[in-house]
Amino acid sequence: MAIDPLHTGERTSLFRRMRVDTRPLRRRDYRNLWIGQAISTVGGEIGTVAVPYQVYTLTHSTALVGLLGLASLIPLLVVPLVGGAIADALDRRAVLLRTETGMAVVAALFLANALLAHPRVWALFVLQGIAVSIFSLGRPAMSSLTPRLVPNEEIAAAAALTSVYNSLAAVGGPAVGGILIAAAGVPWTYGIDLVTYTASFFVIWLLPKMPPLGEVDRPSLRAILDGFRFLKGRQPLIGIFAVDTAAMVFGMPTALFPAIALHQLQGDAATVGYLYAAPYSGAFLGSLVSGWTSHVRRMGVGVTIAACVWGAAIAAFGFTTSLWPAMFFLAIAGGADFFSAVLRSTMLMRVTPDHLLGRLQGIEFMQVASAPSLGDLEAGVLASLTSLRFSVVSGGVLCIVGCIATALALPKFLRYDAREPAA
């Protein structure tokens, strides 16, 4: 059979545009940052299983396990804003080195507590709050390093590469943690966590110094408020926050996964795990074909479409009655959320000047971390008043309505062109 070289070339070109864009990894400093954060993220995800498992086995109280979420939520609402102000005022590499050191120390304390004959439950709560606080303090500095390490045309590719290890760690980390606990015991998970944070420290140490550029504001309440003031009138930034909030508040039914798995899908505990893993699996698969995101010009349109696909997939998930269709639609939702996150992150980094980027990253992290909790609350309350199916389906529909309303109310967000990054 004759092969058409023209069509073969077109297919090759399409494949290159679709596959994950690895150009940023050719740059040594970005590669070191990526490796360091990938190591610590995987270790952190492995460790996430250990704390709730230990609390439950020591107390046999699901209420106390639930309170761990409160110990995490309070720092997530405050500390990222402080971390953003610090990232804009100090050397960002130095901030990361200190936070990685702090995370390693906390992992060592978790390990020491686990090795006691009678581990202290109160210590688990205190250390969990400290760990989340330190992580939230360093996250804005880490997120705001990318524009200093790659050119504008590679920012979308860098954002996609970050999501590669995030999604892979979210799927594999807890599974590895569970296997480790079953095979070797809880202390091993904390030990691996300690090793990964230590390794991450030495990789980040290889980065060049990252002092502030331009004007420097000392970390203060005024500096934090300046970040919020910068948002005023900048529709591209307001739009990315509003669309993601609509998607997470209305279309985030993860709190209902146990009930859906057991009652609507007639499954068991394993089914619950599959539902939690499905969106991250979709995100990982999406990351493998994310090369096209570097060529998107109308990013506001892209964010809106991706968020609407998320809402539609969640609504479809609400109608499912068996596992495989449920996982399929959740994977579609996860892939859509991945593409939305890449485009939102790219817009944020391109629109925001470097001297404010840490603070805007702090605001973004606070929003991303807290909105799903509101979504769980909305889904749970509505399901208790109506039904599981109505809560999920109506949430997906409201997500679509909210995203379209945002796009119509913020025309500059919808018209944002990547060739003109200034807000």
How would you label these PLM feature ranges?
Residues 2-423:
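Alpha-helical transmembrane-bundle signature of multi-pass membrane transport and export proteins
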